[in-house]
Amino acid sequence: MYYPFVRKALFQLDPERAHEFTFQQLRRITGTPLEALVRQKVPTKPVTCMGLTFKNPLGLAAGLDKDGECIDALDAMGFGSLEIGTVTPRPQPGNDKPRLFRLVDAEGLINRMGFNNLGVDNLVENVKKAHFDGILGINIGKNKDTPVENGKDDYLICMEKVYAYAGYIAINISSPNTLGLRTLQYGDALDDLLTAIKNKQNDLQAIHHKYVPVAVKIAPDLCEEELIQVADSLLRHNIDGVIATNTTLDRSLVQGMKNCQQTGGLSGRPLQLKSTEIIRRLSQELKGQLPIIGVGGIDSVIAAREKIAAGATLVQIYSGFIFKGPPLIKEIVTHI
């Protein structure tokens, strides 16, 4: 397969430049016959989750296509679902560069992107142009300059704008790169947010005559007590699913490696065991009442199977896709 050669060339570039170059090429082919260049035939293995039927259990995690620019090209690669975003009500540049770093030996990435995106209105226009007929998740967050205490307003604005176009909506309260965001995972702040989101979901269902499930994306750095509280809140508020997990602040498995001290969230293989353990504990707490979408360090069929064995119904990849390319999609979907 050609990807090892592509990767070698891309890895000569700064990580964000490599990302921009790749998306420049994908934008050129998305929605055109040139999509055949990236198309892969993968088996159909339907999975039902959150009341939706997914073509196969492997999805693209949020963060790669933040603005929904390359939906059709990514679909052609064989994903069972795509999660675009994180998107915010207003456009924002994100944190200062450099803000994306490779840990090549560990097959990990550290990012402190900070929800750089062109805003929810732009994303909706891109979704309208796409021909994608699969399950599209839209991951939403708050603007950096919105005070945390007003954060729920940003989520409600985004929900209203994406509801008609989303297969499901993902609530990102677990990125470590927006100051104070993770505090929304705890106690009264979480309850207030989930109450507002559930009320908005019910209102939008009445307006649009369709029910769009909501999943909450959580961090891997929750302690036991916090995890129990989160599980309890999700169940009490009848949230439809949970995405476990986002990136970690833990550097214990990458000590001494180049870039290991960079600020930001660590993803890829060093996150694999930590995220799987969170899924296992979450599954025990949820007792099958709420589906889990497993994400974090999946870079092989075995890693995907481990997430499912721990309690995930669906799995997603991001960093593994950067390091292994489209062949990883076919490999996982075929053998999972």
From Swiss-Prot:
Pathway: Pyrimidine metabolism; UMP biosynthesis via de novo pathway; orotate from (S)-dihydroorotate (quinone route): step 1/1
Molecular function GO terms recorded: dihydroorotate dehydrogenase (quinone) activity
Cofactor(s) required, per the database record: FMN
Gene Ontology CC terms: cytoplasm; plasma membrane
Similarity comment text for this entry: Belongs to the dihydroorotate dehydrogenase family. Type 2 subfamily.
Catalysed reactions, as listed in the record: (S)-dihydroorotate + a quinone = orotate + a quinol
Topology relative to the membrane: Peripheral membrane protein
Gene this protein is translated from: pyrD
GO terms classed as biological process: 'de novo' pyrimidine nucleobase biosynthetic process; 'de novo' UMP biosynthetic process
Protein origin, superkingdom: Bacteria
Binding site for substrate: K66, N111, R112, M113, G114, F115, N172, N177, N246, T247
InterPro entries the UniProt entry points to: Aldolase_TIM, DHO_dehydrogenase, Dihydroorotate_DH_1_2, Dihydroorotate_DH_2, Dihydroorotate_DH_cat, Dihydroorotate_DH_CS
Annotated source species: Salmonella choleraesuis (strain SC-B67)
Top-rank EC class of the record's enzyme: oxidoreductase
Known role: Catalyzes the conversion of dihydroorotate to orotate with quinone as electron acceptor.
Protein name: Dihydroorotate dehydrogenase (quinone)
Binding residue positions for FMN: A62, G63, L64, D65, K66, T86, N139, N172, K217, T245, G268, G297, Y318, S319
Cofactor annotation remark: Binds 1 FMN per subunit.
Assigned EC number: 1.3.5.2
Subunit (UniProt): Monomer.
Cell location: Cell membrane
Record keywords, A-Z: Cell membrane, Flavoprotein, FMN, Membrane, Oxidoreductase, Pyrimidine biosynthesis
Active site (UniProt): S175 (nucleophile)
